[in-house]
């Protein structure tokens, strides 16, 4: 089924009465950084003010009275007051004596039995510190925990809870909030936080663009795909706000797409275009499900090798000749074949055979397979796609590409032409 994210229109503004009815409470981005600053009323004071201490009032009053008496009878306090009076007496009209001064507990002045009560936390090192002395990250966790206890019904909205928090603390915070069973609305730039939610509970927003949210129930019952989706969102949250995604099989494909784009005058990242390494063709169908029409509905172009053509078509329940209609492009037979053809054997082979990456005996053994000193294009492509040398060969190839040769890598240019059309 479909669901949508509300747009901002004056007629849709929610009233204070409606917010109160649904139990709405909101935490802004600076909330946690200010609520435990020393020298001001803190969220701990607010939390304590909600306690019912009626049964403990007599004991607390007695303790405060005892403290006041102890201060009054203390020689140290008495001496301090004498010295202070001597300093003040010449400066204040009418004069000041020791009997005019008195040290008292804050609770007796404020008529508040809980005045100036502090929260202390023992650290892993065994040192006990006040909440106001903790790191900004720990302050944020304490603040949000207390806020959640004080607002334990309805919805809670939090703006950028990742502020000041270590990535692992971000994850732990969200898991703790989810365990409360409350409805959460969170604005975040953190992939670690976003990945804690199922994809259909995530709305991607971007200035001057419609909000994007997958169809309700997307990936329901598909735990393997959910795991992959959370991993992609965790590590590449910027994909959710991309203007276009180019999905490639692996690292070397990404390197070549970026280099060809650069040499042919197309700025991928300026225009919000992101490249996603799938980790193999078998994951392409999951990428299409997550980021395509039924998912976040982000313009998506896919590049795969020829040997994956039939497999992907079968998974998408279409014929291979229909792949282009789904924005899937094919490198024939693969990008190694294409960049060898574009660069020419002589230049690339000379660079590879003199590269320190290869030991002399490796080059010798390779050429012995073909009984000649210089391989033909097919043989050189075989070396370049070898898993032990694939990355290094791609790096060398990228370094030798020119605008002219880059324009001859057919499948990559087809992808870029589509993206920039």
Question: Predicted segment positions?
Answer:
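Switch/communication elements of ASCE P-loop NTPase nucleotide-binding domains
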Residues: 113, 119-238
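Charge-biased C-terminal accessory regions appended to nucleic-acid-, cytoskeletal NTPase
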Residues: 356-421
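Coupling/switch segment of ABC-type P-loop NTPase heads
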Residues: 14-87, 340-358
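Activity-critical C-terminal alpha-helical subdomain
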Residues: 305-385
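Short, small-residue-biased leader/transition segments that mark boundaries at the very start
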Residues: 3-10
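Extended helical coiled-coil dimerization/tether regions that scaffold
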Residues: 51-139, 146, 150, 155
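RecA-like P-loop NTPase motor core
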Residues: 179, 191-301
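Hydrophobic positions in the central parallel beta-sheet of the AAA+
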Residues: 25, 156-158, 246
């Amino acid at each position: 089924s479909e669901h949508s994210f509300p747009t901002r229109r004056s007629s849709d503004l929610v009233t204070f009465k409606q917010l109160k009815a649904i139990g709405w409470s909101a935490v802004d981005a600076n909330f946690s950084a200010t609520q435990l600053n020393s020298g001001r009323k803190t969220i701990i004071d607010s939390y304590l003010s909600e306690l019912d201490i009626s049964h403990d009032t007599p004991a607390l009053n007695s303790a405060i009275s005892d403290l006041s008496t102890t201060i009054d009878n203390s020689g140290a306090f008495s001496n301090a007051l004498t010295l202070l009076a001597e300093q003040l007496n010449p400066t204040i009209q009418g004069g000041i004596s020791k009997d005019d001064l008195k040290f008292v507990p804050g609770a007796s002045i404020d008529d508040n039995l809980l005045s100036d009560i502090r929260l202390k936390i023992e650290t892993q090192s065994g040192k006990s510190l006040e909440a106001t002395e903790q790191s900004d990250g720990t302050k944020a966790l304490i603040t949000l925990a207390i806020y959640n206890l004080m607002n334990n019904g309805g919805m809670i909205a939090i703006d950028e809870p990742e502020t000041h928090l270590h990535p692992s603390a971000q994850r732990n915070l969200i898991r703790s909030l989810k365990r409360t069973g409350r409805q959460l609305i969170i604005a975040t730039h953190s992939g670690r936080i976003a990945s804690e939610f199922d994809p259909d509970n995530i709305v991607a927003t971007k200035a001057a663009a419609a909000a994007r949210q997958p169809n309700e129930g997307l990936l329901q019952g598909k735990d393997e795909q959910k795991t992959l989706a959370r991993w992609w969102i965790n590590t590449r949250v910027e994909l959710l706000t991309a203007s276009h995604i180019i999905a490639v099989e692996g690292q070397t494909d990404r390197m070549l797409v970026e280099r060809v784009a650069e040499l042919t005058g197309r700025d991928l990242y300026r225009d919000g275009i992101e490249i996603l390494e799938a980790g193999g063709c078998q994951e392409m169908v999951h990428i299409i499900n997550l980021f395509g029409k039924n998912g976040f509905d982000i313009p998506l172009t896919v590049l795969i090798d020829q040997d994956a053509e039939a497999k992907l078509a079968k998974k998408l329940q279409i014929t291979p000749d229909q792949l282009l209609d789904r924005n899937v492009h094919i490198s024939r037979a693969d990008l190694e074949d294409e960049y060898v053809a574009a660069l020419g054997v002589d230049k690339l082979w000379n660079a590879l055979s003199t590269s320190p990456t290869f030991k002399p005996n490796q080059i010798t053994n390779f050429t012995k397979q073909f009984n000649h000193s210089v391989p033909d294009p097919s043989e050189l492509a075989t070396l370049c796609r070898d898993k032990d040398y694939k990355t290094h060969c791609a790096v060398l190839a990228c370094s030798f590409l020119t605008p002219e040769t880059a324009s001859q890598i057919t499948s990559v240019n087809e992808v870029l032409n589509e993206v920039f059309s």
